[in-house]
Amino acid sequence: MCGIVGYAGKKNAESVLVVGLICLEYRGYDSAGIAVLDQGDILVRKSKGKIKDLEAYLREFPAPGNVGIGHTRWATHGEPNQINAHPHTDTNSTVAVVHNGIIENYLELKSQLKKKGHVFQSLTDTEVLPHLLEESKKNGKSNKDSFLELFGKIHGKWAISSVFETEPDRVYFAQDGAPLLIGKGKGEYFLASDISPLTRNCEEVYYVNSGEWGYFSQNEFKLFDFSGKELNPTFKKQELRWEDLDKGGYPHYMIKEIHEQAGIFRKIIQERILENSEIVFPEIKLSKDVLSRVNRIIIQAAGTSYYAGMIGKHYLENFAKIQTDTEASSEFRYRNPVVEGDTLIMGISQSGETADTLASIHEAKAKFIKVVSLVNNVNSTIARESDSYIRTDAGPEIGVASTKAFTAQVLNLLLFSIYMANLKWLISDEEQKILIEEIKLLPAKIDRILAQASKIEEMSSHFTTAKDFIFLGRTYNHPVAMEGALKLKEISYIHASGYAGGEFKHGPIALITNEVPVVCIAPKSEIYTKMVSNIQEIKARKGIIISIVTEGDQEAKSLSDYCFEIPECSEILSPILNVIPLQLLAYYSAIARGCPPDQPRNLAKSVTVE
């Protein structure tokens, strides 16, 4: 959600911070700002809107200096405007603070500070932080001690960075439940909410753990725990290339990432499947003996990852015969679920920082339940705090609406299900070999779908004024219908709902008119005739039918107003192929309606608040 950057070195801090904020744009934001230390003064520059608006402001009011912090804000408290934008300062602008997360007790703290004469300018929870630091300094505390004292006063999950005018060469930082990284360059240090701003200049990085704080200057870095004990951090080599974050000639990250899916599948298949069709997960630390005893799996996820988990439930129950429940992380943690020793919690998160999923993992570990997470960022908090993790291996995903991470999650869940079936002796070598051979054909089939993207582009041009969409699917493709609806409303702002085909007559059919497009996912399968019945019901009520069918299909195609054919495959693999035209439909609908597909309004790539 919010993005934090910081810098101390020889370069112009304003330029470094702005470039860093641009790298964090994909996380979602509504305002941006920086604070730069200049000869003992803190120069705060911030604006509502995009980074380009901040850059325009900086051309008029530059912020010279070599040390500073910056922030992109995604509003949680107070509307998006310049006053509520970060950084925030104390009464006399002696300290500036940027913050990601939520201060849950800010109203109580604000009331206490007002009684002591503090005057607040914004409606944010963040503004209490510089005033708390100011109050500590009034009581004779040093900058360092004031910063440390702050952590015991605030409740919630957060990351903070601060600069003081009396220490013009130093940047302070801390985190308790929200991600922060330190980057080490040549005679300079960087701070960021994720790896993307650090790829150009940093040779090594350190992932700050929850409950750690510290400070850095041009040539100094110190790290402590919340008790004040000094720590000895180990920096890791930074391996992500700047080119990995480039659009690669595509107009948007989303369409680039859609087109990367075949290559990602080739990579996963090559790394996960041996020549003898054996499936390997070398990163899983839990023993095969422990995994073979698992008799229940609870999948925790949010958004698109939740729908991937729903497909994973089908796979795990079908192949490994393990009772599997898929739950929204935000709901699981607020009840008292019945779990036993041989239950496995599986958290799914692209970023590895999803706040609700992380909280659910903490809940599971408090009950002594083993956790294996499926994450795209193996250095993330969720990966570090799980007993083990599985690499999604989708590569950096910058577009806010997840595409390639979704299909990579589904493929990994399928392979993990076969792996678990093998541990439990529930699949023969021959059965596994046949299935693996079909999986190996997926990349070429994805390429064939993407080669027909222009058909979806033309189709989407007919629905620029549509106000509602309905998506229908059954069994494995019910979650695909829900994911297709989510994608469309996320980036084209068209209201859309996804339903199980069997539930259509139980309410949603009342919405059908000649102005409502209905996407029917109807590949050849055991329940194909049921989907054809849905299509006939829609046609009888003059609904607009868009069908996704298997190549060569005539029955469903003849009943449809628009049709897109996917290569033939088993029902088990059909979700992977069926979702790709829905991703394209969402993308081209957004373009046709003039919506920004990479930065849809109100959305954040990494949801780090609960």
Curated annotation (Swiss-Prot):
One of its GO terms (molecular function) is carbohydrate derivative binding. Its main location: cytoplasm. SUPFAM superfamilies: N-terminal nucleophile aminohydrolases (Ntn hydrolases) (SSF56235), SIS domain (SSF53697). This is Glutamine--fructose-6-phosphate aminotransferase [isomerizing]. The gene is glmS. One of its GO terms (biological process) is protein N-linked glycosylation. It is found in: Cytoplasm. Keywords: Aminotransferase, Cytoplasm, Glutamine amidotransferase, Repeat, Transferase. NCBIfam families: glmS, PRK00331.1. It catalyses: D-fructose 6-phosphate + L-glutamine = D-glucosamine 6-phosphate + L-glutamate. Homodimer. Its EC number is 2.6.1.16. One of its GO terms (cellular component) is cytosol. Residues 287-431, 459-600 form the SIS domain. The active site is at residues 2, 605. It holds the Pfam family GATase_6. The keyword Cytoplasm applies. Catalyzes the first step in hexosamine metabolism, converting fructose-6P into glucosamine-6P using glutamine as a nitrogen source. It is an enzyme of class 2 (transferase). Residues 2-219 form the Glutamine amidotransferase type-2 domain.
